[in-house]
Amino acid sequence: MSSNSKAKPTTRENAAEPFKRALSGCIRSIAGDAEVEVAFANERPGMTGERIRLPELSKRPTLQELAVTRGLGDSMALRKACTHARIQRTMSPQGADARAIFDAVEQARVEAIGSLRMAGVAKNLNVMLEEKYAKANFATIERQADAPLGEAVALLVREKLTGQKPPASAGKVLDLWREFIEGKAAGDIEHLSSTINNQQAFARVVRDMLTSMEVAEKYGDDDNEPDEQESETDEDQPRSQEQDENASDEEAGDDAAPADENQAAEEQMEEGEMDGAEISDDDLQDEGDEDSETPGEVKRPNQPFADFNEKVDYAVFTREFDETIASEELCDEAELDRLRAFLDKQLAHLQGAVGRLANRLQRRLMAQQNRSWEFDLEEGYLDSARLQRIIIDPMQPLSFKREKDTNFRDTVVTLLIDNSGSMRGRPITVAATCADILARTLERCGVKVEILGFTTKAWKGGQSREKWLAGGKPQAPGRLNDLRHIVYKSADAPWRRARRNLGLMMREGLLKENIDGEALIWAHERLMARREQRRILMMISDGAPVDDSTLSVNPGNYLERHLRAVIEQIETRSPVELLAIGIGHDVTRYYRRAVTIVDADELAGAMTEQLAALFEDESQRRGSSRLRRAG
């Protein structure tokens, strides 16, 4: 009786063990590292240090799902075997777009190495890539602006290195960009095959490609390159010849002999089901470790504002005098301390109320964080509620539980505060204090917060207008003032270091005019450069965009029209979640998700309520009504 119990899986998880063991062995063999830990969990697939995360299988996995899972494992194993993290880091170009393309092409390189050496790996990767692009709906893309350039370059590189056509679900993306890429970088592309086994030489060619495509600046011979004696100049050897042959045999067995892995897995599925769930959006990253981009995911274009101004008939006379500046650079430490003390004194009576609202928000977030668990797992916290099972049946294994991860753990929030003259007095002091306390609250909950401000450097046009006047007053100059975008707190800066920076908003003469559309684009681009899965942008303003210099030489709705176009672009074509709070100003006519408050003292409640609503589970938010105008 006991022997039968041992022979038959006793839990649903055990049914998948033969498949998981076989796949884990293949991954370690390809990676050439027996210490690699392979985990299957309801988390976004990824690789952190020595740990490779793969998605937990569904209850009844199909052959397609098994092949996709193998493809994900092969992709990450090849990355670990063939990519030297330090070389990748030091050779990486400047700029978010250039880095994204550079990383995508490196992933194409390592996958090409595996495909050329092992037929089983090639087949698994093909299935995984087909699934990846199908999920991203690339087949529906019709315009070049919607097609990610990085993915197109990676597809073209893969085609050149392996001779394989791109997956059918991604063919349109490459077709839209092929003429541009080959027209700009055909000569560089021809050198890729000869350097495929040398990461550093390959990276040099890719940087030349990016320069030819005008995505990255030209590099000198020694720019960003590691010393020769420290780098790997020999061919990448992801494993020994014996390992290579063994891995080939194992991978070939995956596809050619269903009786090995597929059949074993299928037979086990018939005997028992496995716990499974959809892959979550969360990507828990260990700080300080290299975390590769998830191979089974694709990112849509991160720059929805490429050529945007031209399309909406918005011009800028000159950007020569614009500035993006950290708040501490605008005044010295002593003045910042004095301004912060003044801010605290002005709002001493308000801090208690705002603090209570912030604590309420924190309790709601922490309740979400702690109330959701997964049960009947093979590892995690011991589930004391299931211990009676062992008394009833000693053959039952111990049961463990694990806390589920909620969406807000991998989230960044940007608070964009209008620093125009009309905010002077009560509105700006309340906004500064609310931003301060919310940043502290969200930081406690593991949510990163960025606080930005926008204004102009001068009244009545500043140096831009002077240049325009000196140039003979050309017609239709467009925006005619010097922008000042202020970083009060970056997303990665701890609250305690940035606290005093908010006092700058109290400085006499800081608040001038407001050009909202370009400020939104700026804040949006900063968010898009972040690695977090979820990005939220909250605008706090008290009126429509106003700049006397610009409006005196352009149509009266020039800035407002641009703002509306920017908002529509973010709301319809960007993954960033945009919401706005208007102080005494109806912002609901601009933003889909917006609330208007009558008095500045209502700001704290509005901010905490709207953020709390955003962080509610999707199922709870689905039935809730759209934000309504308040006040």
Curated annotation (Swiss-Prot):
GO terms for biological process: cobalamin biosynthetic process; porphyrin-containing compound biosynthetic process. Pfam families: CobT, CobT_C. Residues 218-306 are annotated as: Disordered. The keyword Nucleotide-binding applies. Keywords: ATP-binding, Cobalamin biosynthesis, Cytoplasm, Ligase, Nucleotide-binding, Porphyrin biosynthesis. It comes from the Bacteria. It is found in: Cytoplasm. Catalyzes cobalt insertion in the corrin ring. This is Aerobic cobaltochelatase subunit CobT. It comes from Sinorhizobium sp. The lineage of its organism: Bacteria, Pseudomonadati, Pseudomonadota, Alphaproteobacteria, Hyphomicrobiales.
